[in-house]
Curated annotation (Swiss-Prot):
Keyword line: Chloroplast, Membrane, Photosynthesis, Plastid, Repeat, Thylakoid, TPR repeat
Keyword ATP-binding carried by entry: no
Protein name per Swiss-Prot or TrEMBL: Photosystem I assembly protein Ycf3
Organism: Tupiella akineta
TPR repeat residue numbers: 35-68, 72-105, 120-153
Recorded GO CC terms: chloroplast thylakoid membrane
Length: 167
């Protein structure tokens, strides 16, 4: 049974019904509709913490989806799962791929910055100050770009950047 038919809560059911209606009425190809169905099922599985199932759905969606903008969100979500699983290197690969297709994806920029900041903190703990400095600078670059795109978001990053200027 497809995940879209297993949703138990009201919001998921409502989203599924609306999405199914849109899929039926929008003038899109069967391939695009199928890609969206996999993407939707991936989001549902991801929301429930079923990461392996979500990845399977996202990979299927990637095989079918041809629109670069839509692919960027699939790639971004794959990056999120790898981040959640602690596979930061893999996550970065997917975030970079997402940005290549959609440079105006501030959440990918933010997540890249978070990973670099985390790695900088790890380097600091290992007394690798030069490595930490490079990683902090990378984090700052990505956060600055994310903030440029969405100035009212990422308040913690903005605060960190301001503190950093005063050091």
């Amino acid at each position: 049974m497809p995940r879209s038919q297993k949703n138990d809560n009201f919001i998921d059911k409502t989203f599924t019904v609306v999405a199914d209606i849109l899929i039926k009425v929008l003038p899109t190809s069967n391939r695009e509709k199928q890609a969206f169905t996999y993407y939707r099922d991936g989001m549902s599985a991801q929301a429930e913490g079923e990461y392996a199932e979500a990845l399977q759905n996202y990979y299927q969606a990637l095989k079918l989806e041809i629109d670069p903008y839509d692919r960027s969100y699939i790639l971004y979500n794959i990056g999120l799962i790898h981040t959640s699983n602690g596979k930061h290197g893999r996550a970065l690969e997917y975030y970079y791929q997402a940005l290549k297709r959609n440079p105006s994806l501030p959440q990918a920029l933010n997540n890249i910055a978070v990973i670099y900041h985390y790695r900088a903190e790890q380097a600091t703990e290992k007394y690798q100050s030069e490595v930490a400095k490079i990683l902090y600078n990378k984090a700052a670059d990505y956060w600055n770009e994310a903030i440029r795109l969405t100035p009212t978001n990422y308040l913690e990053a903005q605060s960190w950047l301001k503190q950093r200027e005063n050091i």
